[in-house]
């Protein structure tokens, strides 16, 4: 994790995201929606949602994350471990989070580092990981939202079916049953685990016992405290979160917490 309090040079920020996975921008100022979008566009291309998606701001680059909105999570506000692209082809490279209004209590966010976790694995496990693909959960449009993992992400089925990637295609139509478990990061080209374990149900090329063993070995390994950063939000904080070698989750909270989310794709 890195903290920036002064220069917002785009190359410096991107390099930090590649090396640290999580970058906190902390300045004593309120950001207007247009200022945020301008800053984010220096880092890449901001994904634009249409007005059918619940809680869009301005031209759709920013989406409100709050109770009864997008990424609302459970009834108490907890949102389990996830990343932007979990079971689809192509996804945001960076998720930008701006804290417009903090919670009365709770709402801390946790970020994992799957690049450092990968570095610490033994070579035998690394070679196994390189040789397999993850088997990911996919859903059909006939299924009810409450039966899907997406129930913690989308507030309603229309938003689920309309949420789009940078190419204009909906996230729902880009689902895939297989994903690489090991990827090279687009910023620093280093290997790391692409491991959104909540939507993974096994691995290709391994028998059932081997799949079970590898799944829990990687899950327990990546969730060690030394690979997790906990962020306690202050008003006007920006957190830039890598979506290749990291997951994030949110604690339960009370109060009228409102965060503005944006998805950024590298140019």
What are these regions (language model features)?
Residues 2-235, 244-267:
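Non-heme Fe(II) oxygenase catalytic core, chiefly the N-lobe of the double-stranded beta-helix
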């Amino acid at each position: 994790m890195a903290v920036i309090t002064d220069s917002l040079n785009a190359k410096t920020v991107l390099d930090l995201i590649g090396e640290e996975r999580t970058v906190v921008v902390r300045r004593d100022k309120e950001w207007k929606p247009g200022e945020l979008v301008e800053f984010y566009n220096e880092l890449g291309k901001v994904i634009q949602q249409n007005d059918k998606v619940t809680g869009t701001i301005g031209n759709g680059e920013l989406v409100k994350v709050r109770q009864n909105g997008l990424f609302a999570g459970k009834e108490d506000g907890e949102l389990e471990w996830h990343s932007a692209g979990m079971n689809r082809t192509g996804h945001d490279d960076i998720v930008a989070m701006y804290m417009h209004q903090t919670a009365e209590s709770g709402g801390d966010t946790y970020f994992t580092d799957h690049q450092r976790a990968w570095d610490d694995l033994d070579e035998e496990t690394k070679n196994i990981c390189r040789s397999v693909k993850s088997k990911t959960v996919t859903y059909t449009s006939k299924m009810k939202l409450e039966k899907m993992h997406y129930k913690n992400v989308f507030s309603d089925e229309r938003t689920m079916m309309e949420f789009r990637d940078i190419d204009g295609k909906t996230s729902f139509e880009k689902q895939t049953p297989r994903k690489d478990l090991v990827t090279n990061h687009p910023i620093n080209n280093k290997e790391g685990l692409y491991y959104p374990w909540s939507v993974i149900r096994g691995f290709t090329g391994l028998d059932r016992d081997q799949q079970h063993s590898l799944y829990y070995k990687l899950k327990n390994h990546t969730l060690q405290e030394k690979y997790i950063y906990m962020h306690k939000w202050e008003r006007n904080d920006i957190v830039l979160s890598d979506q290749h070698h990291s997951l994030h989750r949110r604690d339960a909270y009370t109060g009228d917490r409102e965060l503005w989310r944006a998805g950024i794709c590298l140019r």
